[in-house]
Amino acid sequence: MVDNRILRELGPDNREGRGKRSQVLAIDTDFWRIVSIDLSNPKLAKGALADLSGRIVDRTELPADNGCSVDDVISLCKQLIASTPLPILGIGIAVTGIVEPDGVVRKSVHLEWNELPLKAEVENATGVPTLVGNDTNAALVAERFFGDCSPNSMLISIGRGVGAALCLNDVIIEGSSSTAGEIAHVVVDPNGPTCECGKRGCLESLVSDDRL
């Protein structure tokens, strides 16, 4: 990992003890960059460029009044890639809805995407390894790494949509069908307002930003 510039050597470990002195290692923040795309707002794609410690070094946004398309996502990725002379280690994309482990967005009500191979589309267009995941799961991972979150935690996100994420023993629980946190369209009031999904009285239709 040192040869690949993921880690760097700080020097020998000077603690007392027998044997050969080991090297103290740290994350190398001067070489690789990571592209991050947030699609939690279907009409505003947000992008960031970060080093390997997670420190954001650049941000940009792409308005999409008619809803974000795959072309919008690819355009934003390419814009961020072009903004730095440093190599890109990977692209991470957070999407509302149900995302399969292979990066296929099975269903996103707000983005109006169904069975979309987003990972493959972005990788083919950029040549950069890409990870696609649910936005609420991604938020919980961020809270775990950079916040004050325990290894056993739950996060509930309320915005344009409603979602939940669960972490047990430092593992995000997605379920066999990748729907463990999909609470938005659980019907809580059969006589409630019509939801974007077409059903009546979904949790999202009662407590999302648009309804509160």
Predicted regions and their residues:
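Short beta-strand-to-turn element immediately C-terminal to the catalytic PLP-Schiff-base lysine
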Residues: 50, 142-143, 165-169, 173-175, ...
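Gly/Thr-rich phosphate-binding beta-strand-loop-beta motif of the actin/hexokinase/Hsp70
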Residues: 21-59, 155-168
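Glycine-rich phosphate-binding loop and adjoining helix at the ATP-binding site
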Residues: 56-152
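N-terminal helix-turn-helix
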Residues: 1-10
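Conserved phosphate-binding catalytic cores of ATP/NTP-utilizing and phosphoryl-transfer enzymes
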Residues: 9-12, 16-34, 133-153
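A short, polar/charged loop-to-alpha-helix boundary motif
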Residues: 67-73, 179-191, 195
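Active-site core segments that coordinate phosphate-bearing ligands/cofactors
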Residues: 185-212
